[in-house]
């Protein structure tokens, strides 16, 4: 798959807006690379584009239910279809988003871990729900000592590690280390937008206030009504845990706002370091104007 643009960077760095401008100038289609913006029930809290506002096509936004099991492997298959479709239409695919695991899988490929059987997946989830994070973590590292590097509160990765060791008898970390990974793309330009941090932090704070002033509370109430298991990815989207705590009368709305803003800022701070370490050969930009100028007239 040839001639693809990847626009990434920390949350609230301005990726979406700059991607629209690039798409307008280069006959492009925007394809989502944000692991939370795939969910159709939570467009406000995940800051999904308002598709009717734009004159360019957007793909893979709000098309998966929060109740569905989804993975980076499934997303890669959906991505391939969208790139082929864009190429057939003679349009430039512009992959946009900040989910590190998704971007890493595009550039370096996926480890060839066997598909997990449904019964193993079900039993693992049931075990996790019965034991809770702490006891489940202890059980996991007893079966797979390499899993000690995982944080016991990262339930998504704990479940995945347990499923793999349970079905294959081999640590997920051994699979990743010892299998050959095939890159998804052959010819692409990776652009990382890294504006000044204080600018990003300011945007994070303002964006969450704007969400509160819209229908985000109603959106989270609806999410709660779906009884989604708390370890599902959608339940960990920025702002969701804090607003759920507010709706359950555990904290005030002011505390929810302040905590969500703080946690999102901390996440953005980690993203700055992660992008620089993971993609040293990428093109880095500290402003949207600089990025626009560098890829002017980037054509298929």
Swiss-Prot record:
Any Pfam family the entry gives: IPPT
E.C. code: 2.5.1.75
Reaction(s) the record says it catalyses: adenosine(37) in tRNA + dimethylallyl diphosphate = N(6)-dimethylallyladenosine(37) in tRNA + diphosphate
Binding-site list for substrate: 11-16
Co-factor(s): Mg(2+)
Biological process annotations from GO: tRNA modification
Enzyme class: transferase
Keywords, ordered alphabetically: ATP-binding, Magnesium, Nucleotide-binding, Transferase, tRNA processing
Keyword field contains Lipid biosynthesis: no
Region described as Interaction with substrate tRNA: 34-37
Gene3D superfamilies: 1.10.20.140, P-loop containing nucleotide triphosphate hydrolases (3.40.50.300)
Protein family: Belongs to the IPP transferase family.
Subunit structure comment from the entry: Monomer.
NCBIfam families: miaA
Protein name as it appears in the record: tRNA dimethylallyltransferase
